[in-house]
């Protein structure tokens, strides 16, 4: 790395992200091409973006880092072309692209030249989607048309204090100003829109990206994410049954060495998504959650066990990513139905359809563990046998059926007294809602003790390692 790159924030971020001494800069001599509005008199070293390649824990990655000291990091024609060139090289080599964003927007002096070059970058990103992992980190401003860049990538991180992400500025939204709701903040973009996967300090973000890169395959055909497992494959998870409410904790218990890389942690907390390791293999995990516990074992948030529109879309996008990169999927199902609210009713049917389609369309190994309730169409949506799960396990106290047994008894025996309803509810639960009943019908493969979950899911994924599954010939789905 040249002195220019090493001495400013953009270069320091690259040095902190990559293995020491591994970065090689490309296009360091490029400058702005336009001469309009006296641009030739302005210094534009590297045209405001450092581009090149290096390694993270030995894995090849391509990186671009915007330099806010050059025209405030504003994007011009050559700036965008440099990033596009990095994408071309990454696609040839089958390696991830990481973008470190700190930008004031498009250069007005370059107008359509900048727009054309940046439009081509959108196209490069679109073609790279599902082929190589794309990761964005926002350290400064990412506004207007640039906000499409993180939306086109797979994972986005945002500096908690200085990061700003918006399509329209908060003050440009009718009836709003930044004092009412800072729609550009890391909190809003991570908790409300779900566009941001993680927030924190600059150091935290770079560390999270390093961890994520090590969990992911380098492209959709080759997988360098496998590693030796030193954890006991048959390890008993004695307290796993007590963690079924907060499945982020449950997934941590199941994983090799308790490694869990959660994504979109602050968004739609009723649904958990992230990556775990099972026998050294990266597995994508999707799980319903009814409670969120903090490090002091205190309840931070509580949900009713239903599937929300936001949660369904969050899970659907994650499953589609896993399928694109041949990452097996594990689900922990504990769902009582669909969330009933005016907000959810606007989108729940479409959101549930997207999740159903994502599971049904995925050809990767899919394993489901029913850890609690599994009622109605929401259960079917959550990676059931019906939509394509390869293996389904259930804990002994799971309930699988149309609805809660008490509700079913009240509907079927509406005129009966309370004692009769209790009797019929117990009968209904035994005949229609027990895991044994589902297993007799072939909807559950094996009833397992909660403590043995780790060894069973590892065994299932080992068995499914060479899975091959065909799909009807078509250009693409339309859900």
Task: Give the role of each language-model region.
Residues 1-479:
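Ligand-binding clefts of soluble mixed alpha/beta catalytic domains
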């Amino acid at each position: 790395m040249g002195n220019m790159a090493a001495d400013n924030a953009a270069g320091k971020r690259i040095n902190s992200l990559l293995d020491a001494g591994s970065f090689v800069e490309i296009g360091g001599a490029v400058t702005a091409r336009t001469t309009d509005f006296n641009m030739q008199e302005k210094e534009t070293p590297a045209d405001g973006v450092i581009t090149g390649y290096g390694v993270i824990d030995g894995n090849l990655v391509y990186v671009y880092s915007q330099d806010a000291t050059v025209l405030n990091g504003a994007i011009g024609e050559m700036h965008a072309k440099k990033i596009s060139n990095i994408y071309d090289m990454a696609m040839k080599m089958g390696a991830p692209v990481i973008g470190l964003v700190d930008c004031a927007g498009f250069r007005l002096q370059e107008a359509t030249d900048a727009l054309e070059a940046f439009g081509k970058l959108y196209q490069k990103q679109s073609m790279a989607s599902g082929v190589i992992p794309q990761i964005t980190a926002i350290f400064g401003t990412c506004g207007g048309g640039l906000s499409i860049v993180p939306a086109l990538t797979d994972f986005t991180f945002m500096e908690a204090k200085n990061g700003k992400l918006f399509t329209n500025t908060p003050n440009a939204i009718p009836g709003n100003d930044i004092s009412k709701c800072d729609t550009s903040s890391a909190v809003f973009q991570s908790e409300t829109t779900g566009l941001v996967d993680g927030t924190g300090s600059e150091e935290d973000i770079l560390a999270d990206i390093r961890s994520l890169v090590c969990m992911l395959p380098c492209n959709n055909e080759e997988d360098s994410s496998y590693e030796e497992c030193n954890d006991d494959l048959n390890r008993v998870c004695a307290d796993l049954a007590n963690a079924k409410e907060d499945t982020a904790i449950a997934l941590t218990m199941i994983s090799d060495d308790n490694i869990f890389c959660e994504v979109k942690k602050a968004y739609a907390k009723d649904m958990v998504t992230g990556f775990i390791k099972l026998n050294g293999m990266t597995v994508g995990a999707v799980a319903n959650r009814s409670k969120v516990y903090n490090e002091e074992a205190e309840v931070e948030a509580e949900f009713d066990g239903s599937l929300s529109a936001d949660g369904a879309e969050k899970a659907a996008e994650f499953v589609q990513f896993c399928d694109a990169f041949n990452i097996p999927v594990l689900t922990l199902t504990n769902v009582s139905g669909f969330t009933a609210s005016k907000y959810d009713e606007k989108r729940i049917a479409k959101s549930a359809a997207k999740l159903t389609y994502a599971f049904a369309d995925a050809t990767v190994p899919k394993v489901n563990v029913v850890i609690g309730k599994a009622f109605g169409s929401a259960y079917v949506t959550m990676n059931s046998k019906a939509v394509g799960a390869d293996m389904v396990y259930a804990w002994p106290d799971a309930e699988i059926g149309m609805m809660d047994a008490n509700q079913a008894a009240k509907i079927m025996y509406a005129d009966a007294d309370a004692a009769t309803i209790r009797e019929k509810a117990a009968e209904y639960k035994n005949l229609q809602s027990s895991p044994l009943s589902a297993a007799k019908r072939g909807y559950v493969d094996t009833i397992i003790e909660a403590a043995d979950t780790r060894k069973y899911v590892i065994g299932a994924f080992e068995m499914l390692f060479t899975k091959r599954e065909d799909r009807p010939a078509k250009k693409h789905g339309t859900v």
